[in-house]
Amino acid sequence: MPYILLDCDKFIPERMKHTYVYDPEENILPACNTNTVPGDMTERGCAFAGSRGVVGGPIKDAIHMVHGPIGCAYYTWGTRRALSDNEFHRRYCFCTDMQESDIVYGGEKTLEKASLEVMEEFPEASGTFIYTTCPTALIGDNVDAIARNIEKATKKPAIAINSPGFCGVSQSKGHHVFNMTFYKWLKLKRKEFPEKCMPEEEKTPYDVALIGDYNMDWDVAVIKPLLEKIGCRYVTTFTGNASLDELFQLMDVKLNIVHCQRSAEYIAQMINDGFDIPYTRATFFGLSDIAESLYDVAKALDLPKERVDQVIKEEMEAIQPKLDYYKSKLEGKTCMVYVGGPRTWHWIKAMKDLGVEYVAACCTFSHTDDYEKMNKNFKEAGIKDILVIDAPNEPELEEAVKTLDPDFMLVGLKERYLFRKYGVPTINSHSYEEGPYAGYRGFVNFARDVYKAVCHPVWNVLKEGEDKFKNFKGDLNE
């Protein structure tokens, strides 16, 4: 089926290239990762949010300094539930709080003073990440020089991340910038501090690192035991609940396992190119994808398949009774998904595992390869006629909900409030309701939260209330 133009987009015909209905007989990929059309009420985030809010922020023992107005610090605290076991991580927000005078006269002195004060207040911090924002990048503050000054004064690492909000079309650019900057910095510092690298005598043929997991509601605490059960030695995570020192060992493992394939595959590719360490892609959401990922890891490390079979059997036996109950309640329900990038296609087989029908997939910052994977998963799951929208705006989302009338939606942090007003149950599949959602036990948590949202009696009350006002609404329309 060709691309389609939604009714709400008649004044922005360019949006037609971003919207299609999946058909296995057609090879359609939408326009994506492009500049937002003026007048389009986009839901995208900025590049700064991608670097600070997504990839960098979960590093648990470093100071994350936002060099910009206090409004930019919204993305630093109380948004994504990237949890850690560090006492000050996520409890504090560090920002230079740029004022008009700083914009006029420059903010470098303000940045250096604030960073040194924070390091004095928190001597346990391992180092400092400094993130530029739109105003500080536009006035040309030399944050790289300030980072060098801070490093010299504190004798601890200071890393400048130059990803102001305007430097890319979406938060995806911020992911890329952080990956590249951190890789270059780490490669240099490993030579400077060889004692932080893993000693040769400690290395094993089964060392792995998890790339692109940010420990939402302790996902890492579920994934790590799974990998260890099949025979891996878990070394570190990029970046969920990881310390700066632990990340020095990213280049010492035998295999990198890439979970979020949009925000962190960049660094896995660079490590592969620079250190000849292979990587494999994995999805730890949904029964089918978890099993496939475990087999892929075992194959890459030459681990016995029988061990993986046994682990899967044990995990399934532990969750089957609860899973059967939730599946019986959700069978035949319809779901619309609106998330950032990879999770749009991560959830395809997971929905099928629950007996849920997937009716629409909307992505904020997906690239071409994300849509290729999405179409592949649709085909493997045997489903078609799915509405797909790249970087949807608010009217498009409203029209999709009104047209498709899904039983529930998987959404992110900010969209759920709009759709709940429409009477559509929502589940936060971005930062979770009550996770973890990864792994077998996490999938039961996910099924439980979907069940609690969809089957909550409040929706019946709302529908009864709507029925009472039908005649009244009809009179008004006439």
Curated annotation (Swiss-Prot):
Might you give the EC number(s) for this enzyme?
Answer: 1.18.6.1
**Residues noted as binding [8Fe-7S] cluster in the record, renumbered to the chain:** C46, C72, C134
Q: Which family does it belong to?
A: Belongs to the NifD/NifK/NifE/NifN family.
The record's cofactor note says: Binds 1 [8Fe-7S] cluster per heterodimer. Binds 1 [7Fe-Mo-9S-C-homocitryl] cluster per subunit.
Q: What class of enzyme is it?
A: oxidoreductase
Which residues are recorded as binding [7Fe-Mo-9S-C-homocitryl] cluster?
A: C260, H430
Query: What molecular function terms (GO) are annotated for this protein?
Result: ATP binding; iron-sulfur cluster binding; metal ion binding; nitrogenase activity
Name assigned to this protein: Nitrogenase molybdenum-iron protein alpha chain
Q: State the UniProt keywords alphabetically.
A: ATP-binding, Iron, Iron-sulfur, Metal-binding, Molybdenum, Nitrogen fixation, Nucleotide-binding, Oxidoreductase
Q: Name one Pfam family in it.
A: Oxidored_nitro
User: InterPro entries from the xrefs?
Assistant: Nase/OxRdtase_comp1, Nase_comp1_asu, Nase_comp1_CS
